């Protein structure tokens, strides 16, 4: 087997193609030539953690899953607030969340459901 690619990322994704083929063929790789490239320069997924918090470990696992499927963009929607018109035009009753720790605005992050700088890095 020979695997080539124009970049190290291309070679890595080539290994994902081989692993995916092995899943389909019970651990074997069929004989032949495979030429593989993405149809789109950006292949990604958006996850809304502003409305529904998920642990940082889940995000890290998701990055690995996305890489397996050759996705190269991960947009994480980190903050959100509801529409005050649905809550009696009262911002204090409107659901809101901010998921990043801030040293400039320390009280902004949602208590118990945010990503600290230490955990992200």
Cite the ranges covered by each PLM segment.
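Feature activates predominantly on carbohydrate-active enzymes
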Residues: 1-121
């Amino acid at each position: 087997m020979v695997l080539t690619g124009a970049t190290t990322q291309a070679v890595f994704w080539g290994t994902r193609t081989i692993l995916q083929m092995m899943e389909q063929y019970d651990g074997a790789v069929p004989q032949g030539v495979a030429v593989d490239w993405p149809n789109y320069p950006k292949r990604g997924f958006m996850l809304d953690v502003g409305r529904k918090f998920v642990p940082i470990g889940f995000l890290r696992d998701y990055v690995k899953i996305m890489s397996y499927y050759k996705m190269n963009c991960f947009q994480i929607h980190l903050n959100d607030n509801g529409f005050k018109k649905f809550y009696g035009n009262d911002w204090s009753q409107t659901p809101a969340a901010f998921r990043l720790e801030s040293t400039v605005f320390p009280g902004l992050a949602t208590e118990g459901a945010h990503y600290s700088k230490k955990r992200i890095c």
